[in-house]
Amino acid sequence: MARVTVEDCIDKVENRFELVLLASHRARLISQGASITIDRDNDKNPVVALREIADETLSPDDLKEDLIHSLQKHVEVDEPEPDPASMIAAGGAAAADSEEQDDLPETITFDQMSEEELLAGIEGLVPPEKSDDY
């Protein structure tokens, strides 16, 4: 990359590290088939990306937003908040349901094993073969 190209870009993007991130993201987009906004002049994709930033054919803010969006794994969706009145009505119905469920006995059962059955099971275990791992 030509030093002149990087120095031209510093006027547009003040932080060199951010410039590298934006230019590399744009170069990847070009490699994936995005159309370029300047003449290629037999330059490679990173140089083309830097020249696009230097010539201001792309907005650094748009590139930054696109980079952030491409790195996000979970996109937040703004959902409308429910009405307080409907929440109060739903809360009363849920309280009635929970009172009915409290009256039901819990049916959790575990397998019961006597001490003799446990000892017989332990004696029947085969020890692992020794290895040189430890």
UniProtKB/Swiss-Prot annotation:
Region annotated Disordered, chain positions: 76-102
Residue spans crossing the bilayer: none
Catalytically driven reaction(s): RNA(n) + a ribonucleoside 5'-triphosphate = RNA(n+1) + diphosphate
EC number: 2.7.7.6
CC annotations in GO: DNA-directed RNA polymerase complex
Listed SMART domains: RNA_pol_Rpb6 (SM01409)
Keywords for the protein's UniProt record, in alphabetical order: DNA-directed RNA polymerase, Nucleotidyltransferase, Transcription, Transferase
Annotated GO MF terms: DNA binding; DNA-directed RNA polymerase activity
One BP annotation, GO: DNA-templated transcription
Alphabetized InterPro entries for the sequence: DNA-dir_RNA_pol_omega (IPR003716), Pol_omega/Rpo6/RPB6 (IPR006110), RPB6/omega-like_sf (IPR036161)
General function of this protein: Promotes RNA polymerase assembly. Latches the N- and C-terminal regions of the beta' subunit thereby facilitating its interaction with the beta and alpha subunits.
Family stated for the protein in its record: Belongs to the RNA polymerase subunit omega family.
NCBIfam families xrefs: rpoZ
Protein name, per record: DNA-directed RNA polymerase subunit omega
Protein source organism: Rhizobium etli (strain ATCC 51251 / DSM 11541 / JCM 21823 / NBRC 15573 / CFN 42)
